[in-house]
């Protein structure tokens, strides 16, 4: 999440400066973001290496889980630096209209991870059976593959575009203070959102094994669907950001509406498909029929809310942020998560004594608040700001 905040700011600045043909400022944005990403990921690597048990102890008191998780945590921590570099370089590539490279790298990394998980976890084709340690090694290697693929693509694209990399940490159009003002709200927002997710997970854990199993069962398909449509958020940030960099304000607003419409149609189509196939998906799992039924209902609820979630991603994660106003999104996220979502979650679970379906349905209504406020901000156009 923290690395995502750095790459988000990198994307905002690079898109605007490339749109304004301020090449030096674009490279400066890249350099500053890369250094920030390296420092932050190195600190997380150090923390994971020195205090793995203490960190995992915040989530569980089961020593067997902590000991096993520490093995995984120590290895996976080495993927933080490659992940940071990959994300920031990917931001540059997307802003330079080479989004295919990060896409192919992601597909390749998933393929490498899947194959290595099979080989190392279960000890196939002569490899030792490593269990969770094998899963960690597979993830680390897949991240290294991702970095190498993106790095090669980055070099080739620079040559193709005739770009000359510029090493500079000194902005002319903005200051380091402006950079920090943009990044700090995102860091705070992402941290509090992650904390909120942990609170929600803790609540789900207290609902009983069947309820938790049903929610866990839906995780992969939710992640796949949101991941597939999240590209619209990244595209919105780049396309609208370039317009703002060129001071094409009306065009930026019009393009934003087109992207929002595309996201709504795409999400609605995928949601309809998910509702139709929800029973088929849960049928693949060898679990109790009660768990399958709960999982199916949860998928339907998720599908109904998905268009709202996608619109929030496009607006909050792409369009409104493209003008550099990250503070307003932080406020929306904090109110949505901590003033609406978490209280409703606790109310449904501990006061109403509802099961997972009721808790999840009530919790997710906070997405409606986010959308309503984001649309008001969007229509007022105060987010339309050129940093150039």
Model region roles, listed by residue range:
Residues 14-81, 127-184, 240-305, 348-388:
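Short alpha-helical transmembrane segments in multi-pass integral membrane proteins
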Residues 75, 86, 109, 142-146, ...:
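Transmembrane helical elements of multi-pass membrane transporters/channels
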Residues 1-46, 83-102, 214-278, 310-332:
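Small-residue-rich hydrophobic transmembrane alpha-helices
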Residues 56-63, 119-130, 187, 191-224, ...:
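Helix-terminus/linker motif at the lipid-water interface of multi-pass membrane proteins
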Residues 7, 11, 76-95, 102-113, ...:
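Short runs within selected transmembrane alpha-helices of multi-pass transporters and secretion channels
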Residues 10, 86-91, 160-167, 189-197, ...:
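Juxtamembrane/interfacial segments around transmembrane helices
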Residues 115-119, 342-346:
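A gly/Pro-rich, aromatic-decorated transmembrane alpha-helix motif that marks the paired
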């Amino acid at each position: 999440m923290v690395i995502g905040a750095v790459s988000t700011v990198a994307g905002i600045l690079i898109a605007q400066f490339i749109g304004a043909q301020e090449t030096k400022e674009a490279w400066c944005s890249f350099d500053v973001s890369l250094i920030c990403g390296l420092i932050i990921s190195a600190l997380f690597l150090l923390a994971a290496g020195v205090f793995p048990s203490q960190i995992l102890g915040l989530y569980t008191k089961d020593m067997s889980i902590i000991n096993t998780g520490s093995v995984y945590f120590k290895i996976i921590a080495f993927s933080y630096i490659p992940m940071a570099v990959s994300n920031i370089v990917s931001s540059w590539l997307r802003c330079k209209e080479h989004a295919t490279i990060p896409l192919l790298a992601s597909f390749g990394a998933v393929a490498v991870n899947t194959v290595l998980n099979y080989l190392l976890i279960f000890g196939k084709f002569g490899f030792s059976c490593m269990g969770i340690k094998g899963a960690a090694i597979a993830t680390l290697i897949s991240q290294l593959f991702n970095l190498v693929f993106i790095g090669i693509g980055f070099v080739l694209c620079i040559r193709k575009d005739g770009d000359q990399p510029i090493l500079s940490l000194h902005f002319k159009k903005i200051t380091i203070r402006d950079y920090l003002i943009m990044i700090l709200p995102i860091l705070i927002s992402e941290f509090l959102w992650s904390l909120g997710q942990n609170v929600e997970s803790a609540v789900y854990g207290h609902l009983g094994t069947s309820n938790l199993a049903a929610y866990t069962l839906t995780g992969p398909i939710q992640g796949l669907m949101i991941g597939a449509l999240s590209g619209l958020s990244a595209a919105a940030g780049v396309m609208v950001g370039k317009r703002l960099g060129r001071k094409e304000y009306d065009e930026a607003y019009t393009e934003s509406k087109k992207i929002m419409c595309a996201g709504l149609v795409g999400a609605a189509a995928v949601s309809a498909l998910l509702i139709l196939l929800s029973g088929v998906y849960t049928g693949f799992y060898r679990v109790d029929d009660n768990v399958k039924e709960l999982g199916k209902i949860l998928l339907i609820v998720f599908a109904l809310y998905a268009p709202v979630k996608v619109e929030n991603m496009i607006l909050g994660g792409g369009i409104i942020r493209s003008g550099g106003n990250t503070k307003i999104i932080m406020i929306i996220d904090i109110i949505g998560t901590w003033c609406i979502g978490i209280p409703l979650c606790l109310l449904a679970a501990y006061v109403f004594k509802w099961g997972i379906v009721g808790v999840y349905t009530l919790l997710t209504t906070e997405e409606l608040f986010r959308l309503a406020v984001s649309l008001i901000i969007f229509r007022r156009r105060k987010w339309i700001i050129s940093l150039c």
